[in-house]
Structures are given as C-alpha cells and as structure tokens.
Amino acid sequence: METDMNEERTGVVTFKGMPLTLLGKPVSVGDAAPDFQVLANDLSPRTLADYKGKVLVLSVVPSLDTPVCDMQTRRFNTEAAGLSDKVRILTISCDLPFAQSRWCGAAGVEAVETLSDHRDLSFGLAYGMVLKELRLLGRAVFVICADGVIAHAEVVSEVSHAVDFDAALAAVKTCLSK
C-alpha cells in the first residue's frame, strides 16, 4: 500500500472558495481499486479485501460532524434500504472511530458502515483524497464493482457541496447488472 505522500495536485478542490491541495494518487473509472487499511468503530482494521465480491459505495467525507457530511451519510443510509445485499456502503472520514460510533448511534445510521482513516491516511493517499492543509479527506464518492474495478469516481470540486447521489446509484445498478 505504498503511495507517494508527496504527490500533490492543486486546482482540483476548494473549501468555501479557498483552494486546497490534494495528496496521494488519484484514481479513475476503469482502474483497479487500490487497497487501503482503515479502522472500524471497534478499532479493528478493514481493508478492501474484507469486502471482496461486493459492490462498494465509498462515500468519502471530511467529518460526520458537519452538515453536508451528515446529510450525505444519512442519504446513503436511506438509499441502502433499496439496494441488494450484494452492495455495501462505506463512509470513510478522518473522524476517530469513537466519534463515528457516537454519531451513528445519535443519527440512527445502521445500513452504512463508518470507517476511520485518521491513523495513517492509507485510504486518502491511495485514492488521492487527502486535503493537505486540513489533514482531512475531501468529499467524493467512488463505486467499485464486485470485480474490483472502479465504475464511478466523483471528487467534488467544492468540498462544502454534495455528491451526485443519482450518478453514484446508477453506477451501482450498472455494477449489479454485470
């Protein structure tokens, strides 16, 4: 899982109009999804291999304790009810696992698994999503088909704006039809 942390991209994202720098290697549709290691709410490690054979929605947010991230995670939690059991929705942020667990309990979110990239930014670097100036993840959604290939990749250019839910869900349906 070696990624050059010094790989920087500018001109891709802003936060409330302020330009930010993304660290890590960006991914594109058609790429094999890179592996990563994050922490579950119980502090156990999770890697891409833990979800082998599933269609994955990776909902990437800076922090669950912000309004747009809260809305994004709640929306995917609602959408999960209408999806096949072959689909897993993972929300990844740099929030501590304890904070993620508390937030899920307070929000009644049970259909989305929250995962923390706070420890070593493994996910953020592997997907080119680390906001250098904030040491948080940018906002994005990635859909990975069961064969491990990225079917949808949206990096939101203004971090305070929402992802395109319809496009992500359409990609999930395409993956399920393969």
Please provide the spans of the model-predicted regions:
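Chalcogenol-based redox active-site neighborhoods
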Residues: E2-K178
